[in-house]
Amino acid sequence: MRLPVTVKATKPSFLVIWIRYSSAASSPTVSLNPSGRLQQTLAGSVEVKGKSLHSGKFSTVKLNPEIAGAGRFFEFRSRFIPASIEFAQESPLCTTLLKDELKIRTVEHLLSALEAKGVDNCRIQIESESSDDREVEVPIFDGSAKEWVDAIQGVGINAAQNHDGESVEKMVAHVNKPVYVCKNDTFVAAFPALETRITCGIDFPQVPAIGCQWFSWRPIHESSFAKDIASSRTFCVYEEVERMREAGLIKGGSLDNAIVCSAEHGWMNPPLRFDDEACRHKILDLIGDLSLVSRGGNGGLPVAHIVAYKAGHALHTDLARHLTMD
């Protein structure tokens, strides 16, 4: 069994990524192919409540089983908002879904867990503290996706059936030609590959405790996400906290739901769960954002080698849009 590896580099140009892919790829940039697996859903419902990161308000989320072909979608104020790239809106430090003037903020950790655990069809009921709110935020918990993975594993997963009581094969996007999006020296790219792999790099030269990190991961088996990615927590630089609060962000942020690193003093709330926890969390976010490629209960994360460097939610979702253009 091949385990995930961390590649340390002082400069990103020192990282050489070898990608194997077939030269006989079909002409479309992305094709939807059978996966050999059935669409799945939850075996029952599960409800959780928690504080949100940016608004600081509490919200309640109930995950429910859904029929094959329904896909993943939120229910807020009796309206349905599909967890689809068509409804993604650019917002600072999180991914937001917008439909009919209703907003669901910070969806990435929950969607990452659902995508990685194979919950293809799910009705996500969400309620805010106030019945008058036009927007609501998914709870942050400890800043990772561990709470969501525990909830999913606790209730279990079944094959989903359609209205006729039949199982439906899950289709998955295959990248046939390289696709990339970039801004200045940051980028996200998807290359043709025989299997799904994500390679991520971050670089914080002003924060030595973080520095330059690379991590490469692939879903080897069902427990890979829970073991390698899910428990990695969101992180921030201490010197940027006040600026974020002045911008109306991280009102619910604390040392209990994020790992905080100071340029001068290093990590302020150790121990880390992984030496490269910050880089792993970027992969967690990327999986959640690319889950928005999913439609009709099919896979969101494509069969491709996805390589990201210093990227954030805006670039992640931009790549997702490019992957759904054909």
UniProtKB/Swiss-Prot annotation:
A Gene Ontology molecular function term of the record: UDP-3-O-acyl-N-acetylglucosamine deacetylase activity
Cystines in this chain: none
Keyword annotations of the record: Hydrolase, Lipid A biosynthesis, Lipid biosynthesis, Lipid metabolism, Metal-binding, Mitochondrion, Transit peptide, Zinc
EC category: hydrolase
Catalytic activity: a UDP-3-O-[(3R)-3-hydroxyacyl]-N-acetyl-alpha-D-glucosamine + H2O = a UDP-3-O-[(3R)-3-hydroxyacyl]-alpha-D-glucosamine + acetate
Transit peptide limits: 1-21
Binding site for Zn(2+): H109, H281, D285
Coiled coil: none
Alphabetical GO biological process terms: lipid A biosynthetic process; lipid X metabolic process
InterPro entries documented for this protein: Ribosomal_Su5_D2-typ_SF, UDP-acyl_GlcNac_deAcase, UDP-acyl_GlcNac_deAcase_C, UDP-acyl_N-AcGlcN_deAcase_N
Subcellular location: Mitochondrion
Cofactor requirements of the protein: Zn(2+)
HAMAP family xref list: LpxC (MF_00388)
Described function: Involved in the biosynthesis of lipid A, a phosphorylated glycolipid that in bacteria anchors the lipopolysaccharide to the outer membrane of the cell. Lipid A-like molecules in plants may serve as structural components of the outer membranes of mitochondria and/or chloroplasts, or may be involved in signal transduction or plant defense responses (Potential).
Family from the record: Belongs to the LpxC family.
PANTHER family noted in UniProt: UDP-3-O-ACYL-N-ACETYLGLUCOSAMINE DEACETYLASE 1, MITOCHONDRIAL-RELATED
NCBIfam families, per the entry: lpxC
Protein name in the entry: Probable UDP-3-O-acyl-N-acetylglucosamine deacetylase 1, mitochondrial
